[in-house]
UniProtKB/Swiss-Prot annotation:
Cell inner membrane found in the keyword field: yes
Cellular compartments per GO CC: plasma membrane
NCBIfam families: PRK03642.1
Gene name of this polypeptide: yfeW
Organism domain of life: Bacteria
UniProt keyword terms in alphabetical order: Carboxypeptidase, Cell inner membrane, Cell membrane, Hydrolase, Membrane, Protease, Transmembrane, Transmembrane helix
Organism the protein comes from: Salmonella paratyphi B (strain ATCC BAA-1250 / SPB7)
Membrane-related topology note: Single-pass membrane protein
EC number: 3.4.16.4
GO molecular function: serine-type D-Ala-D-Ala carboxypeptidase activity
Protein name: Putative D-alanyl-D-alanine carboxypeptidase
UniProt-listed GO biological process terms: proteolysis
Amino acid sequence: MKFTLVATVLLTFSLSAFAVEYPVLTTASPDQVGFDSQKLHRLDGWIQNQIDAGYPSINLLVIKDNHIVLQKAWGYAKKYDGSTLLAHPIRATTNTMYDLASNTKMYATNFALQKLVYEGKIDVNDLVSKYIPGFKDMPGDKIKGKDKLRIIDILHHVAGFPADPQYPNKNVAGKLFSQSKSTTLEMIKKTPLEYQPGSKHIYSDVDYMILGFIIESITAMPLDRYVETTIYKPLGLKHTVFNPLMKGFTPPQIAATELHGNTRDGVIHFPNIRTNTLWGQVHDEKAWYSMGGVSGHAGLFSDTHDMAVLMQVMLNGGGYGNVKLFDDKTVAQFTRRSPEDATFGLGWRVNGNASMTPTFGVLASPQTYGHTGWTGTLTSIDPVNHMAIVILGNRPHSPVANPKVNPNVFVSGLLPAATYGWIVDQIYGSLK
């Protein structure tokens, strides 16, 4: 009996020695963690001036040393119905959910891949064809190399794919046209390479669409179900989902985006194009029409609190509280600078040179990493200063500046707030 008791105690001690309890976020005043509150407060007035000038909304959260030191919302989650300004616009709150756009790539797809790599279920040097049957060079391809493409090539954006084949727009996509997920994978397989893999770097949504399909192949689950049940739910995240309107959320909880669907104020047309103000549906055309709202490159919605937890997971080296998703070696592997482009890790944007100043500013450490999203979102994670910043916005919720000249430039995109680095620098400049 004594031996059994001693053995039990030793086993319990042994197991507890290997148990990891990661830091969790708490709130603190800016002064408690090294900020000058008066300097930081100046940002408040500047952002409000941007809202007054026409920027729809900004949600900002700042983490320092495991503490949330600033969380605030400015502006309106919805101020337009079509071209009409609402008499009673809906104010943004700190609980407002936003379309993350390409931050989906990091906080859905990369998080899933980092978890699967840590668990030994995938290796970044594996061939893409291992997980996607039929992914190979076609007889008529002018540029070949799909047969030898590895997952790491996709993550580094050196795989040869074009930036945006516009699959849902038949006028542009031609034979690659697809408005259903079942055919989209086949169209991706048929998409010609634009350059010899490894010869240059082109940031491509196609890369992350492929990665989404790979995750689904490994897990035998839809991408949204996998990340929502194995990552977000264990972390206690309640506002991070794909297709929020199908999962119990209502439009007033979500920031609206483009005023006239995907038409850029009436200059773009293709079959089934949305024309009403987008509110609770992913803005990205490939994600919505070609992938049913769930894709590896876009489609995720979240709020600043949930994003803060996900950024803290990265700062913690892979976990939060008693939840471990991956380890610090995996974090280092994915955030290490690419040999092809110092501003990329494995998917993550890295503060590798001065070209990243508009994103990370001039004061963040060179080890800072994160991502941006076309709808007006930024995440910045600085392991040197143990600091993270998330900016969520709905930049396309304003008129197009000049639809016939450039349909992708919105009036709000011409304002200084559209350059995240300035906001980031004001935050760093407030450190004592």
